[in-house]
Amino acid sequence: MGNKTSRKSKEKSGRNYTTELRSYEAACKEDMEIQSFDTRMQARTSHVISTLATGVEVRSLSFDSLKAVIGSLLDMNQEVAKVILDCKKDIWKNQEMFEFVEAYFETSLKTLDFFNALKRGLQGVQINHLFILDGNGYKKTLQELKRFKDADRPFDQDFFKMFQSVYNQQKWMLDKLQRRQNKLDKKLKRIRTWRKLSSIIFMATFATLVICSVLAATMAAPHVAAALAAATPPVGSMGKWIDSLWKNYENEIKGQTEVFSSMYVGTYVAVQDLNNIKDLIKRLDTEIRGMVKNAEYAGELGPVKIGINAIKTQLEVFKKNVEELEIQADMCSTDIRRARTVILQRIINATCST
């Protein structure tokens, strides 16, 4: 009985956004600005999904994967912020639009929480890395290598909870948009500004939801990410492609139990680059136990010296990747805050002048 209920629920969710997707396709045909947005969005989303599909066989995320996801969220936020500012005069005059923009910014706060969790994990990695490079003498370095190897995973349960929160907030945003559109009268639906604004925010939110779903599947159900990456974008607007991707995603995910909740219950993000370093350390640890009985004599052992130097060299490369990812996360967080500040300030100015 439970399976039947679950199946009906999933079949229903697949039809939830059909009307909105068709409306988006129609708007895309009539508005050059939406067409331009659509082209950029389709290329960006396709690139992110393909990047996430890399390495799914080991259920891990590389730095390139995380950077691609962050970059896509950054770009989409910039696109939406630009449209909101371009339409500001019409937005301030219409309560429905105004509330919709507020909801969009509410969603962006959840995204900031996710980036804060990501930054905390990256900072933990950097601290352990610095201890190793600053180790004076082999005895101290060996101790720090062991501490690094035994350290807690940088992306813990908090990271997954924040990610789940971002996903849930994007879903909430889509549902809110759907309810708003159902309440609007026909005259408002024909207003060009509202159509452009709602179409672009809807598609940006839906694309983010799909990307988050594929990111989750990369860890919990690797074959889903691979299947979606192999899907060829159809000719036409992104609405058709996103609709197709979403249906494929739901079909692939059927029969699996609570994919997204399993992400942070007994599962963790295995950053591939970090695991490679830890594997090297483990191998070196085995060699050291066999060759070194007294840490004070480590300086005389050539193989140990070479092994430690090799790890330090790889750690330098790893450090650069961590720093680049942290910079990108900072950029996205700063951009979201800046867009919120600018738009909220203009809301205040518009209110004062009326």
Curated annotation (Swiss-Prot):
It is a multi-pass membrane protein. Its main location: membrane. One of its GO terms (cellular component) is membrane. Residues 270-341 form a coiled coil. The chain crosses the membrane at residues 200-220, 222-242. Keywords: Coiled coil, Membrane, Transmembrane, Transmembrane helix. It is found in: Membrane. Pfam families: DUF677. The keyword Zinc-finger does not apply. InterPro entries: DUF677. The keyword Membrane applies. Belongs to the UPF0496 family. This is UPF0496 protein At4g34330. It comes from Arabidopsis thaliana (Mouse-ear cress).
